[in-house]
Amino acid sequence: MHAEAVAGIVDRVVTRYRRDPTCMLQILREVQEACDWIPPEAVDRMQATLGVPRTKIEGVAGFYSFLYTQPRGKYRILFSDNITDRMAGNLALMERLCSNLWIEPGKVSEDGLVSVDKTSCTGMCDQGPALLVNNYAVTRLSAERIDEIAELVRNKVPVAEWPADYFKVEDNIRKPDIMLASQMSPGDALRAARERVPSDGLMASNMRSWREGLPSGLGGPAAMLDEIKRANLRGRGGAGFTTGLKWEACRNAPLKPGQQRFVVCNADEGEPGTFKDRVLLTSYADLVFEGMTVAAYAIGARRGFLYLRGEYRHLLEPLNAVLERRRQDKLLGTDIIGIPGGDFDIEIHLGAGAYVCGEESALIESLEGKRGTPRNRPPFPVTNGYLDQPTIVNNVETFAAAALIALKGGEWYAAIGTKLSAGTKILSVSGDCERPGLYEYPFGVSIQQVLDDCGAKDTQAVQVSGPSGVCVSPDEFDRVIGFEDIPTAGAFTIFDNSRDMFEVARNYVHFFQHESCGFCTPCRVGTSLLKNLMDKLHNGCGSPYDFTEIEKLNQLLQSMSHCGLGHTACNPVLDTIAKFRPAYEKHMVQQDFAPAFDLDRALASARQMTGRDDAAAHIIKEEFGEENSL
C-alpha cells in the first residue's frame, strides 16, 4: 500500500476519534484492520496528526499481541491454545493447516497471503478447538473444516464470504437461575430505581441533576446505593470487593473543576477457561448496559465505557446496535427515562490481546491509549481512575446483578446464596464432561454438584477460577463455590484421569510467561525461569532440586511482583505438586541435581556437519559410584 493511501486511512480514523491521543489503541486497531498491519508510514502520520512522539506510538503498538508492526498475512490465523484446546487436539489441527498451506507456524507465507500462530484462550472453551481468523472466531474445528479453510485461503476467498456456520458461537446455557433466566425488559430496572425515590426526594430530584445528588436523607442515588449495599453484592471478577462500598467511595470522591465520574465495565475476560461474559454480552447486553446505567445513577456519572477483549471482536457491531437502540428508547443519552439531568452514555473500546488488562488499573491505562501496565495503588480508581478522575470498574456479571437488584431490591438478592456470598454465580464449565457450557447456581453449591450436573465422569481434578485459581482434587469435591471457601471469576475446567496434570500446569505456566507485561523484573524474569524449569521437567531432566527452585521463585514472585499476575504465577505448579506429585516424578531423574539440557545431544548438529561420530566428538558422562557421588 502506497504511503499516500496509508496517510489517507490514518487521517480518516484519527478524525473519527477527534484527534484524541487517549484513543490511541482504537486508532491503531482500526488502521491495522485497513492495512493488515501497522506500517511505518502509519506511525509517521499518527505522530504528525496526534502530536504524540513516535516512541510512544511504537511502545503502545508493541505491547499488544494483536497489533503488528511487521507484515502479517492477509489471512491472520491464530489457534486458541488454552488447555482445553490442547485436549481437543488443536496442535495437530494447526500442523495440518500449516502443511496444507506450506507454511511454518509463527511465520508469514512467502507470498504474504497467510500467517498461522497460536494465541491464548479465546473464550470458546465449550466449543473448541477454536481459532481466530482476522479477529473473528471459528469454532468446533475438525480435520475436515481445516481442509476447507485451507482451500478458502488458497482461493483467496474473503473472510466475509466464508460459510456462516464456521462463525457460529453458541451460548450453551445449561442451567439458568435468576440472571440467565431473567426476562427483564429494557428500562425496567431504571424505572424501578426511580420509583423507589420518596415523594420528597422526587421533588428534590426534579430540581437537580443526578450528578449533583440529593440532600442527606432523601432518596434517588442514595437510595440506589443503599439497595446495592443491602444486597451484599460483591464483585464477580474474582477479587470480591463489596460493590456498594466501591460505588459509595466513588460517589463521595471530591471533584476538581472540570472533572466528572466514570463507569467502566471490564469485559476483558482473559482468564483461561472463562466465557460467561461472552454469553452475557451476546444474549443479555441490555441487562449489562442497564446495570451500568444504574451505577451511573448511583454515583453521578455521565460517561461509561465497555472495555471489550479483542478476542470478542465479533460482538462489537451487535453491541453497538444495542447501544443505539437504547439511545433511541431514551435509555441512554440525555434525560434518561425522564430523570432531569439524567445524562449518561456508553462507548465501547476494544482491547488487543493483553491478559494483564483484566486488572482494573491496567485496563484504565489501556482506555487512556497507553500500554496496559498496572498502576501503583493507592491511589485507587474510585478517586483517581480514568484521566485521574473518580472511576468505578466492575465486571460484566456484577453490572448485570446490579440491574436485577435495582429491579427487585437488595433484600430479595441478599436472601439468595450464603451469608457471606449473596446471589448467584455463573460458572464456565469446560473440559472432560458431557455438557460443557454455562451453569448458574446460588453461592454455596458444591464442586461435586456441578460435576454431577454437567456429566463429568472419572474426574481427577477441577481447576476453579483458571490458572490463577485453585486446583481441586477428588477428596475436596465437597468444597463449595463462595467467598468463604473457593471464590472464582467463573472458570471451572474439568480433567479426567486420562490427563497429565503436570502438562496442565505446564500449559498454564507458559500462559503466564507469555502474558507477563514485562513492567517489573521479578515477574518478567521469574515467569521465564518458571517456564524453563517446567520445560526441563518435560524433557526428562528434572530433579528434587527443581522443586526447591520453584518454591524460591514463588516466594520472590509473591513478595516482589507489581501485580496479581506474578503473585499467582506459581499457583498451578504448587497445587499440582502438592496433590498430583507422581505426575512430576515420572519426569525426574534419580539424583539431587540434573542439568537443564543434554550437552552431548546439543553437539549432534555439529557431528552431522563435520561427519564425525568418534568418541572425541561426544561428551562422556561419568558414572559415579555411591562412594564418589556428589
Residue ranges and their predicted role:
Residues M1-L630:
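Feature of Fe-S/electron-transfer and energy-metabolism proteins
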